[in-house]
Amino acid sequence: MDGFKTSQLAVLLLKEALYTSQKGLLKMVLKTLTIGGSDTWGGGGIQTDLRTFENLNTFGLTVLTCIAVEEGDNFAIRALSVELVKEQLQTIEKNFQLDGVKIGLLATVEIVEVVIDFCRRHQGDFPIILDPVLAFKETQEQLAAEYIEKMKTLFPLVDLITPNRNEAQLLANSEPVETLEAMVDVTKKLADQIKVKMIVTGGGLIATDLYRDGMETRAFAGPLSEKKTNHGAGCSFSSAICSHLAQDFSLFESIDKSKKYVFEAIENGVIVGDAGNVWHPITQKSCGIKSSDK
């Protein structure tokens, strides 16, 4: 009996040692949070954010704001309650010291207000990247003017916004952007209006992305993939920037690395159902390890 009790004690001590070791490891890894929606089809949203975080060597955490579901021949966004979003954020704040935050689809004005309060509490604590999801390629719908105006209140609280050309057009109240020249114009117009660092992406039509911070404009050129597996590219781009910034890469390094990462994810994309989703096999995650690049 004494031997049995001794064995039990040894097992308990081993479990405690493993638990303590795991807790210590969790404290050491970089922790990045995505605040956004769930894409039931798996191509965008928090699903792609978490895959990107893992591929680029950060530990992903989530605050869910909404769920995309099929509705007839289209899709619908089902928002979570404001209280549930608040409770998730409180859980994160209580238990984790974050190294970066990526914000995606917020779904309602009320949820935007909750996220504004969160960003005010943590402005300057860690990089905050905002992908302002204002237009959906699948339906060409535009979100309400009230939502767009509320999002503009969020912009000064983040470190970078990553609109695609269509979202930049909506934010700047501009004409449709179909050429690089028009993209340059809308980027300058938007930067003059909202005074925040931004990288405007070509959105599958233009291979060049444009950075502007009010003082400087910089072009990030690259090849244009002919693959149709680009669903989730915008989500992956912003979460990749978040991961790289969390690893202390400079902003321009982070943008450049993330652009290359997303191109590979499109090239390696997969067809799932009727969707062509970005995909980045986990075996390629070494492209985000800082020590191998410097």
Regions found by a protein language model. Name each.
Residues 47, 227-251:
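Short, small-residue alpha-helix embedded
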Residues 9:
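Cationic, low-complexity basic patches in intrinsically disordered or flexible, solvent-exposed regions
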Residues 29-34, 48-130, 134-137, 283-290:
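Conserved N-terminal subdomain of the carbohydrate kinase-like
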Residues 141-217, 252:
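Conserved phosphate/ATP/ADP-binding segment of small-molecule kinases
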Residues 79, 253-294:
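Charged C-terminal helix
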Residues 57-61, 244-257:
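Phosphate-handling active-site elements
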Residues 18-27:
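Short, Lys/Arg-enriched N-terminal segments with co-localized hydrophobic residues
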Residues 36-41, 220-231:
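Short pre-catalytic strand/loop immediately N-terminal to key active-site residues, enriched for Gly-Thr
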